[in-house]
Amino acid sequence: MAFLKQEYKFLAIFMLVFAAIIAVLIDDNHTPDTREGVYTAVAFLFGGVISIASGYIGMMIATQGNARTTVSARNSIGDAYKVALNSGAVMGFALVSLAVLGLVLVYVGMKAWVPADLPNYILMEIIAGFGLGGSTIALFARVGGGIFTKAADVGAD
């Protein structure tokens, strides 16, 4: 968990800098009164927060599931398999549900926040910022986790 906390500190700084870049650079000339970049940056940050929460929740479920699987393996391999399968199912459903909930919240929130005359295609571009934020954090978490794992393997040798 210490690695996740340290990684998320650096990712928070990156997210803020990248959100500022998005807010400044993204603009649609067809709607001069609306700053799509600001809305997209907010959606980007929210996607990052959802991805960070997913990573943390997934790590907690995986850690507890591994411990429970190890204890169940003392009884039988079948019990251990059931516990591992249930832990994986809970983690998968929880994380996908969190992502869908985040997407719905972004859509409803942006629909209420942006001007009513904003074209739907721009709203969809704003919502794409949510996916970009989630994907960015997931990418960095995967790469950072792989580097951490490799360093731990080298340290163990």
Q: Where do the language-model regions lie?
A:
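Hydrophobic, small-residue-rich transmembrane alpha-helices and their short perimembrane loops
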Residues: 1-157
